[in-house]
A protein has these predicted regions:
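N-terminal accessory nucleic-acid engagement/regulatory domains that precede
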Residues: 1-16
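Conserved ATP-driven motor cores of ASCE-family P-loop NTPases powering translocation/secretion/packaging/pilus
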Residues: 319-321, 325-421
Length: 466
């Protein structure tokens, strides 16, 4: 006979489900999420205050993350007000199909969109000049973002950094010319496609503060060729198709105007090539949300695959300081290592710590399990068993264990997750299945009361209940 008893702390285990806690004030509830526990159907209520502390869904491929985000987004878009804006970074086009409708704003390179929905014609200059008093700072930030990957992953960062300054010089000179005919993506692309270095030097020489940029392209030498080829290559790569038009749409202005859904459609086929543009678009959404002069309304930012947008310049501020400005981030992540690789271990840890509401689905890598176990902490347990030598009787051993042991995670089925909020005891839940906007979710995923047979050291599995 064996027996385990917690003497310090608590444990999340399959037979001991904990009641889902919920706020009592129904007027403040933004999300009403029915879930299944061993006690039956209960509800997770998320208020606007709790959403302002952000939501993270962590889990492997096919574990149920997107289903959860669908359930959350469906309730958010159903209650959007003229003071709110919802921005969705859509990696597979699924969110646009599920939640898009005529009048929504779509930024992306997709050639085929659902009926009645048109792609916005983005104008990079409009986003730079939206704040007349901060044009210089805005442009510096835009150029830094566009060249970030090249600067970080180049053995000789001089060339991408010089090319960045050159792009800044051309764009700021164009802005100062006040010639509206050249203040668009198409004109910028055409300028660099037919670049004449002598005319470029002449353009930069018109302004004293841009003369330093001329040093990069002095003479006909290897340095000049390297810098010019770097900037031309980037412009040709990122300003293509839908992003190379004579547009007039500013994504920051769309956020500022509110009352809309904005979709940033990621093109998986050329995602790595266009990564600087997608990063720039989402960074400007975050920047606009953090620079709002009014706290009225909410800015919901949904990121289905967090790791596809490494090095977002404003994500840490958005997570840690956006709460008072109505910023509410819902992010999906496949594993923790992706965040460590994208942002570095310490920066990633700081960003992840800003998410107060967490849904941990089944993960398949040790790094993610370790992160979850260390986040939830340890407990002390007494393990009692009958000695094989009868004269010794019962033997008790005290050991330290994790709140969530590996065997618990091994048995999580698709659609089940560990729900955790700071300051509250975590609970294992089964989520319903999203069936479409306006439809009641199906209680497809449910959890039967499950026990661990300590005598045989085996675990009985979950039962799927419809």
């Amino acid at each position: 006979m064996k027996n385990e008893q917690i003497i310090d702390g608590y444990s999340v285990s399959l037979p001991n489900f904990l009641t889902v806690t919920a706020g009592n004030d129904t007027s403040l509830r933004k999300i009403d999420l029915p879930v299944m526990t061993a006690r039956g159907v209960e509800h997770i209520y998320l208020t606007e205050k709790e959403l302002s502390k952000h939501v993270l869904a962590l889990g492997g491929i096919g574990s149920g993350k997107t289903n959860l985000i669908d359930l959350l987004v469906s309730q958010i878009v159903s209650s959007i007000t003229p003071e709110d804006v919802v921005v969705i970074f859509d990696t597979k086009g699924d969110f646009l199909k599920k939640f898009g409708k005529p009048g929504d704003i779509v930024f992306g390179n997709l050639t085929s969109l659902p009926n009645g929905i048109e792609s916005a014609k983005w104008n990079i200059y409009r986003d730079v000049t939206i704040d007349e008093e901060h044009i210089n700072e805005n442009l510096l930030e835009v150029c830094k973002t566009l060249f970030l990957d090249r600067s970080l992953h180049n053995n000789n960062p001089f060339f991408p950094n010089a090319a960045r300054d050159l792009l800044y010089g051309v764009m700021i000179a164009n802005i100062r010319s006040n010639d509206k005919e050249i203040l668009n993506n198409q004109a910028l692309l055409q300028y660099f496609q037919a670049l004449d270095i002598e005319k470029l030097r002449e353009l930069l020489s018109k302004y004293k503060d841009l003369k330093s940029c001329q040093y990069y392209i002095e003479g006909k030498n290897v340095q000049t060729q390297g810098v010019v080829s770097e900037v031309v290559q980037l412009v040709r790569e990122v300003f293509i198709d839908k992003f190379a038009l004579v547009g007039n749409t500013s994504i920051r202005e769309c956020v500022r105007n509110k009352g809309k859904k904005i979709f940033i459609e990621y093109d998986l086929g050329i995602g790595n090539t266009l990564a600087p543009i997608y990063r720039l678009l989402l960074d400007m959404v975050l920047k606009e949300a953090l620079c709002r002069d009014s706290q009225r309304g909410n800015v919901y930012i949904v990121i289905d695959e967090f790791s596809l947008l490494p090095n977002l310049q404003h994500i840490a501020d958005g997570v840690n300081f956006g709460r008072e400005l109505g910023v509410k981030i819902i992010a999906g992540l496949q594993n923790i290592e992706q965040m460590y690789e994208a942002y570095g271990e310490y920066s990633a840890g700081s960003i992840l710590s800003g998410f107060n509401t967490r849904f941990f689905f089944k993960v398949n890598d040790s790094c993610s399990r370790k992160y979850i176990q260390e986040l939830l902490g340890t407990n002390r347990q007494i393990y009692s068993f009958q000695s094989s030598e009868k004269q010794k009787g019962f033997i008790e051993q005290v050991y330290t264990g994790y709140v969530v042991e590996d065997w618990v995670y091994e048995k999580l089925p698709i659609g089940a997750a560990l729900f955790h909020q700071n300051g509250k005891i975590p609970v294992i839940i089964g989520l319903p299945e999203f069936t479409g906007l306006g439809n009641q979710p199906l209680n497809t995923f449910a959890i039967q009361s499950t026990t661990r047979d300590t005598d045989s050291n085996q675990t009985k599995g979950f039962k799927r209940i419809n």
